[in-house]
Amino acid sequence: MERKIINYIVVCINEFALSKNLTEQEAFRYLYANKGIEFLAENYDIEHTLSLQDAVNDLSIVCRNNGGMIQ
């Protein structure tokens, strides 16, 4: 995986954690378990052009669709 994609995923994890009142570790585990990390890696070309809030919203939807319970 390219460094720029890794950096973007890290930023998104941090933003997700802040928006959902989670630690970074909790956010990573949740996103990993519910395919959010996979989504970001596969859709980097589109997602990185959007705002971070849009990315967090997309992650919330993807994770809910894969069994996640965080609103």
Positions of PLM-derived features:
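Charged/polar, solvent-exposed surface patches and flexible loops
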Residues: V11, E15-L18, R29, F39-E42, ...
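Charged, low-complexity, helix/coiled-coil-prone segments
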Residues: M1-Y8, A41, D45-S51
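N-terminal acidic leader/helix
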Residues: M1-A27
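Long, compositionally biased
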Residues: D45-Q71
